[in-house]
Amino acid sequence: MSARLVAIALGLLVLAGCTTTRQVAAPAAAVLVGAELDAAQARLAAREQALRAQPVIAFNGRVALARGREGGNGRIEWRQQGGEYRVTLSAPVTRQRWSLLGHADGRARIDGLEGGPREGADAESLVRDATGLEIPVGALADWAAGMRADPARFGPAMVEYDAAGQLLRLHQDGWTIDYTGWQVDAAGVAGGLPLRINAQRDDARVRLLVDAWQLGDAPETQ
């Protein structure tokens, strides 16, 4: 993937050129059995039920995207309302923005790319074809919130927990999602909400650092 494609993809976010991302060993999962496993599974199911009942799920924070030795980073805003989502990447220094609007049927539109808007029938394919980046946009909101994505679209998920029964890792659609930090006092959400998420499939990597979550009737950021 060329540096030019990365620049188009991230809307001139701060690029890392040929910088490699430092790899940190993932924590080992606990082997839970009996009542401990039942409690962990119940907590995950309760989180998913509480979050899917929310009319709006939104977060903002920082994101780093990489494929192989190429990558970049910037600010991210994500707003999910039903089956529709809008994700915006921005670079505060250059004041440039790159946004994706996705729909429940998979259709999507990218604004902010060189050459004007682009549309496609599948969000992941649109992003990949337009930018060369591999971003799991259809499932990322669920994974970021500590939920399994729709198995009808993304296949079954394998779940790993830590010794306290907290969600540690998800495996789904070829991606491995590690949870390394939590907001444990998130009101009404069993087990809290993730603050640090690392996702990887082959040489594609997405790292999220969430600054704030908004649930319910969260106003849309303009």
Q: For the regions a protein language model found, what residue spans apply to each?
A:
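C-terminal motif of bacterial Sec signal peptides marking the signal peptidase cleavage site
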Residues: V14-G17
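Bacterial signal peptide processing site
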Residues: T19-R22
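Flexible, processing/modification-adjacent segments and terminal tails
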Residues: G112-D173
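Gly/Pro-enriched, hydrophobic low-complexity segments
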Residues: M147-Q222
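A short, Trp-centered hydrophobic/proline-enriched beta-strand micro-motif
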Residues: A45-R69
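Post-signal peptide N-terminal segment of mature Sec-exported envelope proteins
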Residues: A25-Q54
